[in-house]
Amino acid sequence: MVNEPRGNGSPGPRWEGSSSGSESSRTSSRCSTPGLDPERCERLREKMKRKMDSGDKWFSLEFFPPRTAQGAVNLISRFDRMGAGGPLFVDVTWHPAGDPGSDKETSSMVIASTAVNYCGLETILHMTCCHQSREEITGHLNKAKQLGLKNILALRGDPIGDQWEEEEGGFNYATDLVKHIRNEFGDYFDVCVAGYPKGHPEGESFEADLKHLKEKVAAGADFIITQLFFEAETFFRFVKACSEIGITCPVLPGIFPIQGYHSLRQLVKLSKLEVPQQIKDVIEPIKDNDAAIRNYGIEQAVSLCQELLASGLVPGLHFYTLNREVATIEVLKRLGLWIEDPRRPLPWALSAHPKRRVEDVRPIFWASRPKSYIYRTQEWDEFPNGRWGNSSSPAFGELKDYYLFYLKSKSPKEELLKMWGEELTSEESVFQVFAHHLSGEPNQNGYKVTCLPWNDEPLAAETSLMKEELLRVNRRGILTINSQPNINGKPSSDPIVGWGPSGGYVFQKAYLEFFTSRETVEALLQVLKKYELRVNYHIVDVKGENITNAPELQPNAVTWGIFPGREIIQPTVVDPVSFMFWKDEAFALWIEQWGKLYEEESPSRMIIQYIHDNYFLVNLVDNEFPLDNCLWQVVEDTFELLSRPPQDKRETEAL
């Protein structure tokens, strides 16, 4: 361990003046080495080709923008849950009535951008040319490119009234839109178009519709997604007809698991499809029983998909979810396409933005708030690759709005109060909230604490390796918000701590990050003198007054992996400079997400305010990863010192 030298040349802790991460400049130094996972840099069509060449089947999911801000929060949560099953891509529909190209949180553009940037999903944005000028469409495409979207589903769109009216200076057909994309943007976008297995409802004939489809492909479309259908033979005839007229690109069948009588009627009305009589005969008698219809819909979809997959004509399945998850996930599980335990390319959640696809290093502080980290680094032109580098001023943007919908807690205020306490009576009340979050046991009101302001997701699997120790220290006022155990050469396939390619080994230094009182910090600093050559620490208050024994600009790698034929990868670091940016956010969350649940000047609000104003944020790293984790002993020694009579404490300080 390297420490900042004192004036006499010996190592020791260093006090820093008040500072805030927001005061640093935007200049940064970054190193670039080959990425860990080449697949992250593949285009969607390249991913499709690789899977088709290997015979691996895939699935994809369609969603539509919500109508409300809370609906947007719920949809992003659904992206995270359904993204865990391993879709090759998702697509987001274009709703002309919902101002789809705007910056509204319910717009198609923002929802698709969020799926890419904050949920790490390969995403296709629908775009229609109906009632839009050439300039408007070009503007939408430029905006999509800027936001990191690389895939477009080009559609004509539906007329607002009953009759189609040509747009002066616009486009009249999806073919025109595909040509425009290729003329203006070259090969930047992968382009998908729609196919109609029974012909477009407004088409002259099935043959004429196929001719238009071939024109769309010839104009530059890369693949086709079909409208929904209910019988496999419908798709087989369509694919055969496509092949006969020279369409050779992938054709993905659109699958709609029937989930309710009214939703089926509405979808059939919009798509102008005819439901087969045998399906009507089953549904009509049970039309008022949603559970029975959903169960039938699952069985029907599984049977249809099995027939499609068995044909050898289907490389993947595209599901129309209607923003629901239960039926689609059940179908995918029965087909064996849902990934129950996805392998993690890196220890943290990825972004699918093209400029972040070589990113493979992040500070550990945002481990439980990856969307916040992505938001605060969205203006970076380059991202750390290979190592964090020796940067004196990483350009973290300020997090002024804690209620951006993709950063907002998934739980409404009423649920948060039930979890965190409708009334707090003391600091110990807060300690109990942290303890209940770790234990998973209901609190005194009978509610489970499933989240905290610093962690809106389920606890990481590796937390189970330290659960008893974490519970013990949280009950005594060491309020942990981030931690990891030490790991010495576990296989990369390990179900709890594994990440990266097969055949590798992963390593971790023990890490502990927590809030605690001034009294505890004073005792901790006395104890840390015994661990000076082993434990790095950084302690800071809300004003930025901080003490550390880590050299100012030296990041400490706390997670790394060794893989066959590759350089060592170190995806997680403890960086003292970044910690000062993180502390602003970490302290603010006390007030923004917890304190503001209560009335101003109320006892509960004042307790949270007191913790915000007086507690310290601490991080500890045990550098001796091959040995038993010493951080628990550090904390136990601190508690033991706190329990001594004042005279004994003074004698200890004098040693």
Swiss-Prot record:
Record region (Disordered): 1-39
Keywords: Allosteric enzyme, FAD, Flavoprotein, NADP, Oxidoreductase, Phosphoprotein
Residues reported to bind FAD: 93-94, 126, 156-158, 173-174, 196, 200-203, 209, 216
Active site: 62 (proton donor/acceptor)
Regulation of protein activity: Allosterically regulated by S-adenosylmethionine (SAM).
Annotated pathway: One-carbon metabolism; tetrahydrofolate interconversion
GO biological process terms, semicolon-separated: methionine biosynthetic process; tetrahydrofolate interconversion
GO molecular function: FAD binding; methylenetetrahydrofolate reductase (NAD(P)H) activity; methylenetetrahydrofolate reductase (NADPH) activity
Chain positions recorded as substrate binding sites: 158, 227, 320, 324
Residues the record lists as Phosphoserine modifications: 10, 18-20, 22, 24-25, 28-29, 102, 393
Residues that, per the record, bind S-adenosyl-L-methionine: 455, 460-463, 480-484, 559, 572
InterPro entries noted in UniProt: FAD-linked_oxidoreductase-like, Fadh2_euk, Mehydrof_redctse-like, MTHFR_C
Cofactor annotation: FAD
CDD domains with a match to the protein in the record: MTHFR (cd00537)
Family: Belongs to the methylenetetrahydrofolate reductase family.
Subunit field text: Homodimer.
Name of the featured protein: Methylenetetrahydrofolate reductase (NADPH)
Taxonomic classification: Eukaryota, Metazoa, Chordata, Craniata, Vertebrata
Gene name as annotated: MTHFR
